[in-house]
Amino acid sequence: MKHFGLLTFFLLVGCSLNAVNDKEVENQVIGQEQIEAVSVKPHRTLDEKIGSMLMVGFMGTSAPKHSQICKDIRKYDLAGVILFDMNPVNHKQAKNISGKWQLTKLTRELQACSKDGKLLISVDQEGGKVQRLKSKYGFYGKFPKASDVIQLSDARVQQHYNEMGAELSSVGINYNLAPDVDLAINKKNYVIYKLGRSYGANPKQVVKYASIFMDAMHNNGVLTSLKHFPGHGSSLGDTHKGFVDVTNLWKEVELEPYRLLAQTHNIDTVMVAHVFNKKLDSKYPATLSKKIVNGKLRHEFGFDGVVITDDLQMGAINKKYGLRNTLKLAINAGNDILLFGNQLSVKSMVKTSTLVNNIKNLINSGEVSLNDIEASNKRLDSLKNKL
């Protein structure tokens, strides 16, 4: 399956980045003809169709049958879960990850809760500061950050990432929310540049190392996600904490890694950022923007794969939009997986049942289309067929 239309990419290079007309976006049938012929699972209930759009975080280093997360996976046919090592409630205790044997047991329990054994079990494992499998838990934990990776030989980079993929696979993690393909174009950027999460300012260099990363993950049966569309490298603020406007900082070149990777790779998923860019959408940040997700990523770029939001509990979203409105906008924007990490604060934690019931109410009120949810289900099923 071809996940990006190359012709649309070449057209994009010569096009302005003016916002896509709302009416055109609403009237188009987004990528339906391109969705792989994978039907929605038979007998999937409304609750399960909704649940198949959700990836959630949870408290616990185990998932026995009576646990809430296991019940939620089984009842709602969740798309997946996201695992963390740090516990936001008690920093002295692990949230989900405390050791190799423990994590292997946890992922097996989680898959046993699922109906198809293909639950997406995800972590952020980039290297450097962003790696959940740390040495203090018995893992390697010393994978270099992206800005250090580019100083190594290609053979060494391949070795590092193959070892990373093998380690993830060995403990049952099948989805790595990486690589980061943001460009290092703002030296004052704390969340990307100063943490060394970017492979550089040159798109071709970023693509080179992101390709090695993706190939290594795929060789070990681990799915990947390009992030953070349409580009977080130029930003000054941190979307974890609050609203971030990149209107006067963002550059079109930040789209280039996505275009180039589309020519050589079958891209699994794309993660959308919470950055606000008035030139692309004068009203909403990227994650909640129909003009950016359905308009630019799907319509202009021709991407028909799975689109996942960044954590919708981050300050950029959580502080500005209520839960119901966030769900409505995120679904209508064209996202397939809505990520709720339940990680950033105790107050922001939300029950899966609350998410499902809110979306169900949105469907019943006509504010969200069931057809859009079923289209997302098909894209998710197609993605899971890779596992």
Segments from the language model and where they lie:
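Sec-dependent signal peptide recognition
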Residues: 1-9
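C-terminal motif of bacterial Sec signal peptides marking the signal peptidase cleavage site
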Residues: 13-14
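Preference for extracellular/luminal or secreted protein segments
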Residues: 17-75, 290, 299-300, 318-387
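Short, well-ordered coil/turn segments that N-cap beta-strands
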Residues: 52, 79, 115-119, 173-174, ...
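Enzymes and membrane/adaptor proteins characterized by extended Gly/Ser/Thr/Asp/Glu-rich
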Residues: 72, 77-205, 233-246, 273-288, ...
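Surface-exposed amphipathic alpha-helices with a cationic face
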Residues: 107-115, 169, 211-218, 262, ...
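Phosphate/pyrophosphate-binding betaalpha-module
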Residues: 209-225, 253-267
